[in-house]
């Protein structure tokens, strides 16, 4: 990729962040600027479904399609996630649920369950706990049976999310090495 291509690619990404579809069309169709997967990723972050559709229809390179789904999930853009996965056939991976949980988007997690998503990683629960999203944490653990680890306890404690911490402790989440939970009291080392 030459410097000019790299500059054009960055320009397309920046235009996608403006949410101005007509400008993106102009730089692609009239100015023939190059683009890459980060353009559709930016459109997903912004929740711009029409721009995503334009990117798909015009074969925006999507070697990292799963990131577009993850960004839509992280930002709570259900319509975009639905279109990317169901119509454009973009894959999703463990980041899709993990980033939705991190941002507290229970509706995204519910959609994933409806669609038989099964790529939950331990940090889905850790991300929910770290950011105080008790509803997501409970849903992941009780409905999805997502795995968890000691990081969830550490993050809930470090970020002062007592409701998440208590839920983790009450439900026997593993503790960080050297930590103890005895008689209703957490002891950290």
Give residue ranges: language-model regions.
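Ankyrin repeat (ANK) tandem alpha-helical domains that serve as protein-protein interaction scaffolds
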Residues: 1-189
């Amino acid at each position: 990729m030459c410097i000019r291509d790299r500059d054009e690619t960055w320009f397309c990404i920046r235009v996608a962040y403006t949410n101005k579809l007509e400008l993106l069309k102009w730089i692609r169709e009239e100015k023939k600027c190059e683009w890459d997967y980060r353009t559709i990723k930016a459109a997903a972050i912004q929740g711009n479904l029409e721009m995503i559709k334009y990117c798909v229809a015009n074969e925006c390179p999507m070697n990292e399609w799963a990131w577009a789904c993850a960004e839509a999930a992280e930002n709570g853009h259900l319509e975009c996630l639905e279109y990317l996965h169901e119509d454009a056939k973009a894959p999703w991976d463990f980041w899709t649920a993990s980033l939705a949980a991190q941002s507290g988007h229970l509706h995204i997690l519910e959609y994933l369950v409806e669609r038989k998503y099964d790529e939950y990683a331990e940090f889905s629960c850790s991300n929910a706990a770290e950011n105080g999203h008790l509803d997501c944490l409970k849903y992941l653990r009780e409905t999805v049976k997502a795995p968890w680890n000691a990081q969830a306890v550490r993050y809930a404690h470090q970020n002062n999310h007592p409701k998440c911490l208590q839920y983790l402790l009450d439900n026997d989440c593993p503790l960080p090495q050297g930590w103890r939970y005895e008689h209703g009291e957490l002891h950290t080392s």
